[in-house]
């Protein structure tokens, strides 16, 4: 009502939670069946890796991204995300999403988008993210957050 057009509105969601009880893919599919009938401009699925499979055996035959994209039936554009590091990852995500979000890779390889457009794939930072960020001069809060998030499992 108060924003100038065009003003896009989207919704980012987590398809599953690790906790019990928590959101399960079945719950998310129920929600998406309703959201696809709204006037949202896009949906953005939150995934740590784009090829993640649901916890439920009922949904183990495809990736979560595939289930989400199928459920939307092309009615709302989907933003896919999750450990997208190279051209093949982008192409794989685009098979089940209209847009791709790049997060961690842009931290360790800030020119990644330029390299992608200019077909300089050989220059992509390919070291695992958990190692690559440690070689950068990052602001202390970001570095400390990443260190806390990626500390080795005991």
Explain the meaning of each model-derived region.
Residues 1-154:
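Flavin-dependent oxidoreductase catalytic cores
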């Amino acid at each position: 009502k108060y924003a100038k057009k065009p003003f896009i509105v989207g919704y980012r969601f987590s398809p599953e939670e690790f906790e019990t009880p928590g959101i399960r893919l079945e719950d998310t599919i129920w929600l998406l069946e309703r959201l696809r009938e709204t006037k949202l401009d896009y949906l953005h699925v939150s995934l740590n890796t784009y090829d993640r499979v649901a916890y439920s055996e009922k949904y183990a035959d495809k990736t979560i991204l595939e289930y989400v994209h199928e459920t939307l039936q092309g009615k709302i554009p989907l933003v896919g995300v999750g450990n997208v590091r190279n051209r093949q990852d982008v192409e794989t995500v685009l098979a089940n999403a209209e847009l791709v979000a790049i997060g961690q890779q842009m931290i360790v390889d800030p020119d990644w988008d330029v390299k992608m457009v200019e077909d300089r794939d050989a220059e992509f930072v390919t070291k695992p993210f958990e190692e690559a960020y440690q070689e950068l001069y990052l602001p202390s809060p970001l570095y400390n957050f990443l260190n806390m998030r990626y500390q080795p499992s005991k």
